[in-house]
Amino acid sequence: MRIIAELPHPDFKISILNMNQKFIVKIEKGVFEQTYKIPEMDLTDGVNSIFELLDESFLQTVSARFTDMNKDFKDTYFRYNY
């Protein structure tokens, strides 16, 4: 697995990796992680196409999903530990 790029973002860490003819977009926030695998053949402009996919609308959805993940984890944690 090879790191292609790391993109700056104020809320989470975005890494683009390459492995087995796939681009892997890894987005991390705290203990949570979202990973998206995109075959190289599906992209016409290589890694530049990944940059286009990571638009503001997508990143807002990612942020909302992190919020949901945090809530789900806290709910289950408190259900079994308190």
Model-derived features: positions:
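Short Gly/aromatic-enriched secondary-structure transition segments
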Residues: 38-42
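N-terminal acidic leader/helix
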Residues: 2-37
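Mixed-charge, Lys/Arg-enriched low-complexity segments
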Residues: 43-82
